[in-house]
Amino acid sequence: MSSRKRKATDTAGRHSRMDPNLSSDDSQNPGAVAAANREVLDAGREDIISSGTERQQARKEKQDLVQEFEEPPNKVLQENRERFSRIMTSSFSAMEVKIKDVLKTHCEERQKLCQDYSLQFTNLNRKLTSDAYKLKKHAETLSNMFMEQQKFIHESLTLQKNRMKEFKSLCEKYLEKLEVLRDSRGNSIAEELRRLIATLEIKLLMLHNQQKTAAPPQSLLDVLFS
């Protein structure tokens, strides 16, 4: 082989081993330069997308961690709300039952008192009617016996006077006992209400203290978000 042919073969081999992207003459290979630029842009875009995904993942993990710390206090507050509702419902129900019992008891006592005194009034009225009838009969029978009639009338008037006093006394006692019963009913209801309200205040205070004890410390959230 001549020296000229050997030189041409060596030159062709060197060109075939060279990287097109590393060519020094850009004007001779513009397609290779464009492909290299696209590879650089794609790599940068992938880095940006990867960085955004990592930030979203980190933000989600932080939110999950915050939710983990916030879930127990919310659960405790919900349970305390339900307990408070049950206590209020139970207290008002007990108060209503107590008031109904007191009113029922006083109503029964009042009815019994009215029945007792009504019976006494009826008996006394029957006696008064009977005495008036007897007085009339004796007055007609003893019309001719003035002295005896006068004596009997005097005795009858005295008896009527005493029984009218008894009737008046009975009325006064009835009104007095009715007034006492009315006052005692009001006092009993007021006392029962005060007692139930005091009990309710104690329960609410205990529930408030339990809520304060169950509340998480604020410093834990400060440490979490710091």
Curated annotation (Swiss-Prot):
Protein name stated in the entry: X-linked lymphocyte-regulated protein 3B
Q: Does the keyword Coiled coil apply?
A: yes
Q: From which source organism is this entry?
A: Mus musculus (Mouse)
Q: What is the lineage of its organism?
A: Eukaryota, Metazoa, Chordata, Craniata, Vertebrata
Question: Which residue intervals are annotated with compositional bias (Polar residues) in the record?
Answer: 21-30
Q: Does the keyword Coiled coil apply?
A: yes
Q: Could you name the domain of life of the organism this protein comes from? A: Eukaryota
Q: Which family does it belong to?
A: Belongs to the XLR/SYCP3 family.
Name the segments for region: Disordered.
Answer: 1-65
A Pfam family found in this protein is Cor1
Coiled coil regions in record: 159-210
Per the record, where are the segments of Basic and acidic residues compositional bias?
8-18, 39-48, 56-65
Question: Mind listing the UniProt keywords for this protein, alphabetically?
Answer: Coiled coil
Gene Ontology biological process: positive regulation of dendritic spine morphogenesis; positive regulation of synapse assembly
